[in-house]
A protein has these predicted regions:
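Alpha/beta enzyme core
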Residues: 1-45, 54-247, 258-287, 293, ...
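Short gly/pro/ser/thr-enriched loop/turn and capping motifs at secondary-structure boundaries
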Residues: 83-86, 251-255, 323-326
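Active-site proximal loops enriched in glycine and acidic residues that flank catalytic Cys/His/Asp
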Residues: 220-223, 247-251, 296, 317-321
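Substrate-binding cleft of secreted/luminal carbohydrate-active enzymes
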Residues: 304-330
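Short, basic, helix/turn surface patches
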Residues: 103-111, 243-253, 340-356
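C-terminal helical cap(s) of enzyme catalytic domains, especially alpha/beta-barrels
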Residues: 89, 327-341
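Conserved small/polar residues in nucleotide/adenosyl-binding loops
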Residues: 368-371
Length: 371
């Protein structure tokens, strides 16, 4: 926020210097035009969602971290239900989640931080990674059948135990659904969930989060598929009708291949001839001008509108886009600058476009001196 405010000061300072010059020159037309720019100036300061991962510790650590973020200017805090000490990227395998009681305690801790600092309308985004998480670090505490802990434990994969002779030394046993269950435990001590329970766990995560202080949901998925997202959101809205979803249009997805395969599959189901396409090779540039690729691009273009309409997505975001644009542009510039184009690679590919598009950093001293 400090840099954003400095950017405002830089832009407004330049406008006021232009205003002084226009007045000194008795140029009334230019003066009115500059005053209009000042009156309609759009600040660089925008709302920021602070991502605090899994809270970096227990609920007390989460509370302290959230306070720091809010004091720094964050209007929204995003927190996820992975374990703090073995957290993975949302699109990697091996994710481990925590029982609902642990996660809900952190949601309440964030709310307390907002309240203590006098922010009545602070936003909490509760993210669930359960769709791609096949493991849990601990068995949930349960006091009676059907409570939240019991529901969490019902997703554990394991073997029914008939007698004590079925147990080995150190085995853990859970009573669930009227039976004794020995959860499948890895050498690391982690417990495995039943296969194909991810969507059910996501739905339960989201409902309980909204019922315990969260404002928005974030469902981490393995692919950008409107039907999959809508299937989960519709189930959530059966319990919480006004549930709203934040969705990450992640660069981790191979959008081109994924949507081309979605079109391939839908066409195949419709009985259309897809014999000229190799499904696993659809990323190839050889397909770029085909009807399938054109339809896939159309679906990508309308993804945000389609997902908002059909899947209840309230806010679309894209994580780390500038990381990728910086890497790509730097790679291209290096190839051109040290290749045949030489300095023209920079001038034609960067500076000429900056000047014509009115990019403020054409004169780097304006911003480098702010740091």
């Amino acid at each position: 926020y400090t840099f954003l405010r400095q950017a405002d000061a830089r832009e407004l300072g330049g406008l006021f210097r232009q205003l002084d010059a226009a007045r000194a020159a008795n140029n009334d037309v230019q003066e009115r035009a500059i005053i209009n720019q000042i009156d309609n100036f759009q600040t660089h300061v925008v709302p920021i969602i602070a991502d605090i991962d899994a809270g970096f510790g227990n609920e007390e650590a989460t509370y302290l971290l959230a306070k720091k973020m809010i004091e720094a200017g964050a209007c929204a805090i995003q927190i996820e239900n992975q374990v703090s000490d073995e957290k993975q990227c949302g699109h990697q395998d091996g994710k481990v989640t925590v029982p609902h009681a642990d996660f809900l305690a952190k949601i309440r801790a964030v709310r307390y931080a907002f309240i203590e600092l006098g922010v009545e309308n602070g936003i909490i985004v509760a993210r669930t990674d359960s769709l791609g998480a096949g493991l849990t670090k601990q068995i949930a505490v349960t006091n009676e059948p059907g409570d939240l802990g019991d529901q969490y434990n019902s997703f554990l994969d394991g073997d029914v135990v008939q007698t004590a002779d079925d147990l080995a030394n150190g085995d853990v046993v859970v009573k669930a659904n009227g039976q004794l269950l020995r959860p499948k435990r890895l050498a690391s001590g982690l417990f495995r969930f039943k296969p194909n329970t991810g969507e059910d766990r996501v739905v339960l995560d989201c409902i309980t989060s909204l019922q315990n202080g969260a404002d928005l949901l974030w469902i981490e998925t393995e692919k950008p598929h409107v039907g999959q997202i809508a299937g989960m959101v519709n189930r959530i809205r059966e319990v919480v009708p006004n549930a709203k979803l934040v969705y990450n249009n992640s660069p981790s997805f191979n959008w081109t291949l994924n949507f081309r395969q979605q079109v391939f599959d839908s066409w195949a189901e419709e009985g259309r001839d897809v014999s000229t396409y190799a499904r696993d090779e659809l990323m190839s540039a050889d397909y770029d001008e085909t009807d399938l690729a054109i339809e896939a691009d159309r679906r990508i273009q309308s993804f945000q509108a389609d997902a908002a309409r059909e899947a209840g997505i309230f806010h679309h975001l894209i994580t780390l886009p500038t990381y990728h644009t910086a890497a790509l542009s730097t790679d291209n510039l290096a190839k051109e600058y040290f290749g045949e184009a030489g300095m023209l690679g920079y001038v034609a590919g960067v500076q000429r476009k900056e000047i014509r598009q009115g990019i403020a950093c054409v004169k780097p001293v304006s911003y480098t001196h702010l740091t």
